[in-house]
């Protein structure tokens, strides 16, 4: 869950949203305080990587199936030892180059890996009428400077973005909200909640390295303030004011957003 009207902007910029992949998953608990998930998955497609979204579009496919010439593994561990606090760590590793339907097993791309490595730590604190969440994501792409030159990216009729792709990307953010209705007995007894929240995040989808051209506009800081009103447990009405800060050569981007969401799936 998240307080903002839209998904956390940094993670939604560089990583696939609602990331579903074909594969095998094992999960379970160790005692009462530990939870684990281990997955063996189809790899991403480097042809769909781009400057503004890093690997985000690599999980999508133009077909009703996903080519799986390359594979990936993912691991997540959560700890619940402290009441009200969840601490999580996760990692992903997989190859992405030459993972398409029309692959050339004897071509130059077959000699490249395009290894995607992602590490993440996150936490949620939900106690004393406060909810505090934070996360840090860091990603690395092997053979990044060669992804732009892959066969199929530079032709005029190519459906893929011809822009360069960064070797590294980063997204981090923290948000905190306090339930105002916890101080109003009648509304609290009626299970209504009104969280007043603030959020800060920093992200960069293209951290240029080596001889790569620099694009400073991809580095952004963002703040948001707003409310989440729960008339009933599963329904939330959200409103926020946000301000995106870019480098001095670019205009900052303020915005106002309103939304209604159903959270029953995540309960």
Segments from the language model and where they lie:
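Surface-exposed coil loops of outer-membrane beta-barrel proteins
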Residues: 1-78, 95-108
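Charged, low-complexity intrinsically disordered terminal segments
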Residues: 78-79, 88
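Outer-membrane beta-barrel pore domains
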Residues: 84, 88-267
């Amino acid at each position: 869950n998240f307080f903002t009207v839209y998904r956390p902007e940094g993670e939604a910029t560089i990583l696939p949203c609602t990331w579903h992949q074909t594969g095998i998953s094992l999960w379970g608990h160790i005692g009462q305080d530990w939870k684990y998930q281990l997955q063996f998955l189809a790899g991403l497609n480097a042809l769909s990587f781009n400057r503004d979204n890093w690997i985000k579009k690599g999980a999508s496919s133009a077909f009703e199936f996903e080519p799986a010439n390359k594979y990936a593994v993912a691991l997540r561990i959560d700890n619940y030892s402290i009441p009200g606090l969840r601490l999580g760590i996760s990692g992903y590793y997989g190859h992405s180059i030459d993972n398409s339907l029309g692959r050339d097993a004897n071509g130059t791309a077959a000699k490249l890996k395009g290894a995607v490595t992602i590490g993440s730590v996150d936490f949620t604190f939900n106690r004393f009428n406060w909810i505090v969440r934070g996360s840090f994501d860091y990603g690395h792409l092997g053979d990044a400077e060669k992804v732009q030159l892959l066969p199929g990216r530079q032709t005029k009729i190519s459906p893929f973005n011809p822009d360069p792709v960064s070797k590294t990307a980063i997204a981090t953010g923290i948000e905190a909200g306090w339930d105002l209705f916890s101080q109003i007995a009648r509304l609290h007894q009626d299970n209504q909640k009104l969280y007043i929240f603030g959020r800060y995040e920093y992200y960069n989808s293209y951290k240029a390295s080596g001889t790569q051209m620099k694009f400073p506009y991809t580095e952004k800081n963002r703040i948001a303030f707003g409310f989440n009103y729960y008339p009933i447990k599963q329904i939330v009405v959200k409103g926020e004011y946000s301000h995106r800060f870019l480098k001095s050569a670019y205009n900052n981007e303020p915005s106002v957003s309103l939304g209604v969401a159903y959270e029953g799936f995540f309960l």
